[in-house]
A protein has these predicted regions:
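Iron-sulfur cluster-binding cysteine motifs and their immediate structural context
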Residues: 15-39, 55-79, 352, 430-448, ...
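N-terminal capping/small domains of soluble enzymes
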Residues: 83-193, 199-203
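Immediate flanking context of iron-sulfur cluster ligation sites
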Residues: 2-19, 42-63, 415-419, 423, ...
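Alpha/beta enzyme core
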Residues: 121-126, 200-338, 344-351, 355-359, ...
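Iron-sulfur-cluster electron-transfer modules
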Residues: 34-107, 111-114, 128-129
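Alpha/beta catalytic cores of nucleotide-metabolism and tRNA/nucleoside-modifying enzymes
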Residues: 1-3, 76-90, 313-327, 332-334, ...
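C-terminal helical cap(s) of enzyme catalytic domains, especially alpha/beta-barrels
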Residues: 143-156, 297-311, 365-390
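Short, charged low-complexity linear segments at domain edges
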Residues: 1-9, 27-50, 396-417, 430-451
């Protein structure tokens, strides 16, 4: 089984709670090993099954409750080579954000994943470094049902690439929420507790910020970006006005001594305009992005026959979030950044860090897979640092920013031709179809041998064929000068 198929098969795993496969295996934890592969840590996966015999893994496979057919646990794990990274010298992931020590860069984003004491405490116990607690306001919050829907992958119903929500802010009383934050900070003094707040006028912003400071919070986040607020003058409507966000940031900065973080909306043409206004008003950091306004005709998005605009998140929004982060990091008004948007694996988080974020916030992936994903977020980032011989996480912050330039600065005098790997090719012809109908008609397809052939004189190196190939049989060659 090749590497591609290892991931493909592991992606079928249901990621069960109290996994039957592990209960059936007396010598290891195959469920944890499969989860490591699922979240982009395939090489260290063997550490959880190093004592397992073939018979143990066969018992685990027989116990699998997948609704189609059992995950091929033994075949997956026996296909993995031993880890090439020494796990006895993993670096710690300590980093500072707004002058606050964070034990790692991974925070819960203000959302449904952190709405009460027990949830946040469980996340802290699991290894999350901090929380941007669900946004607190003075208005009464009433939610709709249902309020979530998703864009599913075809293969697995429970796995989705895009997620939509109509949820607003905390339904708790203000007093209840700040008591929760006070207890969290008292009981978890090494964790970072950030109060996310939202007001309708200056007096409300000031009042809530002072309550956050009095509760012992490490910082306060000003939510200028929720896209589905029922109340006027709140959420992303405010975030689109540089004048308003500047005024609200300034009044909070005058009122408290703890760091102030302004949260930006992506539902705007130039995110740098309100962000710069916040920095000018004294904001200590910018967090971005919140969810993207969206609509769908899916049945799950309907409430008694009616629909509304709601917020879109998940893996699909990550490239959009990264683009906003790039714009923010290039602002003349320099500030620290907290990255949000589509983070699911350690590689996703690394992209935000390399574009200038000192920490990252996660929501949708936690809603899908639980707080336990922190294990692989930490493990993957540590292994990456070892392989790069990087001793401190701060060395990675912003290191990829210089790679980005305007389109006119890119090399247009060279080309990378694709090549067909005959061993992997199954002759489906998908590359031919896409190149004929969406490319440059640079692939011939022999219907007798079912073999595609790339025509070099027509190929422009767009790589559409490589992207649509379901078996990974089309690979890039070396870059050469155009003829």
């Amino acid at each position: 089984m090749g590497k591609l198929n290892i991931y493909e098969e592991a992606s079928r795993c249901l990621l069960c709670q109290d996994a039957p496969c592990t209960k059936a295996c007396k010598t290891g934890d195959p469920a944890r090993a499969i989860r490591a592969i699922r979240f982009d840590n395939h090489k260290p996966a063997l550490r959880w099954v190093k004592e397992c015999s073939d018979a143990d893994l066969e018992h685990a496979q027989q116990a699998c409750i997948h609704y189609n057919w059992p995950i091929r646990i033994k075949e997956i794990l026996r296909s993995i080579h031993p880890d090439d990274v020494d796990d006895s010298h993993y670096p710690d992931l300590t980093i500072t954000f707004c002058g606050i020590r964070c034990e790692n860069p991974f925070f819960l984003a203000s959302s449904a994943v952190c709405t009460n004491y027990e949830m946040v405490a469980n996340a802290f116990d699991a290894g999350w470094a901090g929380v941007f607690y669900k946004t607190i306001c003075l208005q009464e919050i009433k939610e709709v049902s249902p309020r979530f829907d998703a864009m599913h992958n075809n293969a697995t119903h429970g796995d989705f690439y895009g997620f939509r929500n109509m949820e607003q802010l905390s339904e708790n009383t203000v007093e209840m929420d700040f008591d929760i934050l006070r207890r969290l900070k008292q009981n978890y003094p090494t964790k970072v507790v950030v109060a996310s707040i939202m007001g309708q006028k200056e007096e409300e912003w000031v009042m809530l910020a002072k309550m956050a400071e009095e509760a012992g919070c490490d910082a306060v986040e000003l939510n200028f970006s929720c896209p589905q607020m029922k109340h006027k003058g709140m959420g992303s409507d405010v975030g689109q006005s540089p004048e308003l966000v500047k005024a609200y940031t300034a009044c909070v900065k005058r009122s408290v001594k703890i760091p102030v973080i302004s949260k930006m909306t992506p539902n705007i043409t130039h995110i740098t305009e309100p962000a710069a206004a916040c920095v000018e008003a004294g904001a200590d950091a910018i967090s971005a992005i919140n969810t993207i306004k969206s609509v769908t005709m899916a049945p799950d998005a309907e409430v008694t026959g009616r629909r509304t605009v709601s917020g879109y998140s998940g893996r699909a929004v990550r490239p959009i979030a990264l683009r906003h982060i790039l714009e923010l990091v290039k602002m003349p008004e320099k500030t620290e950044l907290s990255g949000i948007g589509g983070i699911e694996t350690w590689r996703d988080a690394l992209e935000f860090i390399q574009l200038g974020c000192n920490n990252v916030q996660v929501c949708t992936a936690v809603m899908q897979y639980g707080y336990r994903i922190i294990d692989d977020l930490i493990l993957g980032l540590q292994r990456y640092m070892v392989k790069r011989s990087v001793s401190e996480l701060s060395q990675l912050v912003g290191e990829r920013v210089p790679l980005f330039m305007n389109p006119d600065g890119l090399d247009r005098d060279s080309i990378i031709y694709p090549k067909v790997d005959r061993e992997r090719c199954v002759g489906c012809g998908r590359c031919y179809v896409s190149c004929m109908d969406g490319g440059h008609q640079a692939i011939d397809f022999n219907t007798d041998t079912r073999q595609p052939r790339i025509v070099g004189t027509k190929c422009v190196g767009c790589h559409l064929c490589r992207l649509v190939c379901p078996t990974g049989a089309i690979i890039p060659t070396k870059r050469i000068a155009k003829k």
